[in-house]
A protein has these predicted regions:
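Transmembrane and membrane-interface helices of multi-pass
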Residues: 1-154
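Basic, amphipathic N-terminal segments that precede the first structured/catalytic domain
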Residues: 138-162, 322-328, 332-336
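Helix-hairpin-helix/helix-loop-helix acidic hairpins
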Residues: 36-37, 130, 150-180
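Solvent-exposed soluble domains appended to multi-pass membrane proteins
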Residues: 167-495
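Alpha-helical scaffold segments in carbohydrate-active enzymes
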Residues: 88-94, 157-162, 177, 394, ...
């Protein structure tokens, strides 16, 4: 499964960049790897005697064939039973819908998933885009009357007219979908941070469990003094980090089975509502992105420039002065803040790496080991917390520099994860941090979204259910940016 997707998306080289983690994963499970070869060895040694089909009569072979055909027909019929279901995990939608590799593999097996993946790669696939069937012309409710007094977050695109003027079926489906969507509206938080500088941080494997008053006081301060999104969820997308970035930065759902950000850059797709592009449109003086790992990992050098940023990373303008894994978030801040701190206006994006998995042996966990050594957790969990202390040090440094430059009160800082710390799964580490057995259907995806500015006088509790898809539209509203809310998968949390 992984090999097919990686190779078809140009990711073979990325696998070699993580060869140390791959080898560690294999050696830690060597017993199970050896067991995989036991059936093959058994067949080689005893197969000739136990599986001699030459003695089976034609009648017996026909019976076996008929049973196999019956099973195949039954399976096909079972797939079609729930074809009208709206459940994306129904048998029908898993088989005929957008390819969800992990779910399809679990339901139909590895070979079926690979066959579907390869066939769609070779022959293409047309998605079935469903439009909102709710009628537009209905009796106004009290909520709708209130909304008429507000302003819809839309732009001048006339999707009804565009639908009539195109013969392209795919474009027509998109226009119809956008036209059917209910827009977000201006609200009490519209323009709250208009004119502010913005620093957006996607923190590797970050979670709410990394926020601690004693271990990570700066992260704790930002959460407890800022917007507190109590029901925020971060899905585990198919391509982990880069798909998490895609959702965070575009407000769109990444396509399963491909590197969505990489493919979008390859196809020169425009993202007019990203903070990078919006900042350039407004004449922002400095629009930079940074990453403290290899510059072209996941093709970041292509997709971050495609959404409006001037990009620096290891091997492309950023030298941290040490060759370790993972690299230090603190050192990245120390090396980059001077690039923009004195600019009249700046829009900055960071993709951190200190929190990367492999917590029992990596450099960041070891660097801060003394600070967690007395905690009553397993070594893996202590390593995870130690790695996030490095992120906290980076944020402490950033806030101190902003305050010294007199820009803490007019800078909005947004920090969230790319995905939950799934490297802890095999050690049941997330449950250990939570203090109870974590539900793997929903609870494990609950996370923290830190949104804070030095100008905030008191925290704001937000109990609305939201996800990483909602970050961009929410920020766009709060920064007073012009955007069309119908064209994003996420929605403004307050709109």
């Amino acid at each position: 499964m992984v090999v097919v997707s990686s190779v078809t998306n140009g990711g073979a080289g990325q696998a070699f960049n993580s060869i140390d983690m791959i080898m560690t994963a294999i050696t830690s499970r060597i017993v199970f790897v050896v067991l995989l070869f036991v059936p093959l060895a058994f067949f080689i040694i005893f197969g000739g005697k136990l599986f001699d089909f030459s003695k089976v009569k034609l009648k017996g072979k026909l019976i076996v064939l008929l049973i196999a055909v019956a099973f195949q027909i039954g399976t096909v019929l079972a797939v079609g039973i729930d074809r009208d279901s709206s459940d994306t995990k129904s048998n029908y939608n898993l088989y005929y819908g957008e390819l969800q590799q992990v779910a399809v593999c679990e339901r139909y097996g590895l070979y079926t998933m690979q066959r579907l993946d390869i066939s769609r790669l070779m022959f293409g696939y047309k998605a079935n885009i469903r439009t909102n069937s709710k009628p537009k012309n209905k009796e106004s409710t009290a909520d709708e009357i209130t909304k008429t007094e507000q302003k819809a977050q839309i732009m001048s695109a006339d999707f009804s007219k565009l639908t009539k003027n195109t013969n392209n079926d795919e474009l027509k489906s998109l226009y119809e979908y956008f036209d059917s969507e209910e827009p977000s509206y201006t609200n009490e938080y519209t323009g709250m941070f208009k004119g502010y500088n913005i620093i957006f941080i996607t923190a590797e494997s970050f979670s709410q469990y990394a926020i601690d008053k004693d271990l990570t006081p700066t992260l704790w301060k930002m959460y407890n003094e800022g917007f507190q999104f109590e029901n925020y969820y971060s899905p585990a997308w198919g391509v982990s980090t880069t798909d998490g970035e895609y959702a965070n930065l575009t407000g769109l759902i990444p396509k399963s089975g491909v590197w969505s950000f990489s493919k979008s850059a390859e196809n020169n797709v425009s993202f007019p509502f990203t903070l990078g592009e919006q900042s350039r449109k407004l004449g922002c003086k400095t629009v930079n992105a940074y990453h403290n790992h290899t510059y072209d990992y996941y093709d970041r050098d292509k997709y971050l420039t495609n959404i409006g940023y001037d990009y620096s990373a290891i091997g492309k303008g950023l030298d941290l002065g040490e060759n370790v894994w993972p690299n230090s978030d603190l050192k990245m801040m120390q090396k980059t803040v001077d690039d923009y701190i004195n600019s009249d206006s700046f829009s900055v994006y960071y993709m951190t790496v200190s929190g990367h998995g492999g917590y029992s042996y990596n450099t960041m966990s070891e660097r801060n080991a003394d600070l967690v050594k007395d905690l009553k957790y397993s070594d893996e969990v202590k390593g995870y917390l130690a790695a996030n202390i490095e992120l906290d040090k980076a944020m402490e440094y950033l806030l101190a520099r902003l305050e010294k430059a007199g820009k803490l009160d007019n800078t909005l800082i947004c920090l969230t994860d790319d995905h939950y710390p799934y490297s802890l799964d095999e050690f049941d580490g997330v449950s250990e941090l939570a203090g109870h057995k974590v539900d793997t259907t929903f609870e494990q995806y609950k996370n923290a979204w830190l949104l804070w500015s030095g100008s905030m006088k008191e925290p704001v509790k937000v109990d609305t259910y939201c996800s990483s898809l909602d970050i961009l539209p929410t920020l766009s509203n709060m920064l007073g940016l012009e955007y069309d809310s119908r064209m994003l998968a996420g929605t403004d949390v307050f709109g």
